[in-house]
Amino acid sequence: MRKSWKLGAVSVALVAALGLFGCSGGDTTEQKADKPAAPQTETQTPEAAEPESEAVELQIFAANSLTKAMAEAEELYTQQNPNVTFADTQYEASGTLNEMLGAGQYADILITASKGTMDDAAENGYVKEDTRQTMFNNDLVIVTKEGGDLAGRDISLEDIAAGKYTLAVGDENVPAGNYACQSLTTVGGYIEPDGATGADATGKGGEFSATLQPKVTLGGKVGDVCKYAESGEVDIAMVYTSDVYRMGGVAICSVVPNDTHKAITYPGAVCTDSKNAEAAQAFLEWCMTDEDANQIWEKWGFELAQN
């Protein structure tokens, strides 16, 4: 009898213990579903940050007439693309730039002031032909000292050929000088060896007429040519419209007729030895397509070419 009582007591105690565990120790299925998931103990790997663009420094060889416009464009480009900066851009006569490349000097981009000088660069392997594009157009003008005796006077090519004025033009390395000589062939002021005139002439290798020769001063850069007129060292000079904007101190007497010389264009191309060809090409494309860049070219007297 006592043995049966003990067995019953043990059974009751066991049932009570199980009931207590069920109330306090475990969650029901519904409770588990409502509970937020416990945080993972494994270290979470953050997403990798996008790498910064690689820093690039571009070296540009540009025609002398681009001095102020290109400097402003470079500054704007760096503002928009902080990873791209520019080395000391070389502004020289286009022929001189080719001579520099031929001597082994490094450049990423070449921009000249004539098709002929870019043709020479391509023939000598200085630029990648497939990157070449015409960037700007310009006009040839006859200028004199601002406020001087000739300011406001309409001066023609015939007047120049007649020896009425002292004249400054660029030498054979200066495209502006080539254009000037081409135009003077149409009035007998410059004679080419083969007798070519106007747009068929090269503006090189010939000589000024006996009447004009004593009146001519040659300049190694178009900027120097403009300064001769500004200072009054010569009566007039033949330069680009853009030179009037960038140099100041001169007034336009007349615009040289476009049909008396080859079209004034500024081709640009990536140099063959460029170590930054992709960045160089991107800059050239920006020059041609960015609206703010276009405002800069217009401000300094350049017109975007329609390629």
PLM region spans:
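C-terminal motif of bacterial Sec signal peptides marking the signal peptidase cleavage site
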Residues: 18-22
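Short, glycine-/small- and polar/acidic-enriched structural segments
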Residues: 132-140
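Bacterial N-terminal signal peptides that target proteins for export
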Residues: 1-10
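Hydrophobic helical h-region of N-terminal Sec-dependent signal peptides
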Residues: 10-17
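Short beta-strand elements in bilobed, periplasmic/extracellular small-molecule ligand-binding domains
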Residues: 85-88
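Exported/periplasmic ABC-transporter solute-binding proteins
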Residues: 24-79, 90-95, 102, 114-115, ...
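Short beta-strand-centered segments that line the small-molecule binding cleft or hinge
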Residues: 108-114, 118-124, 128-133
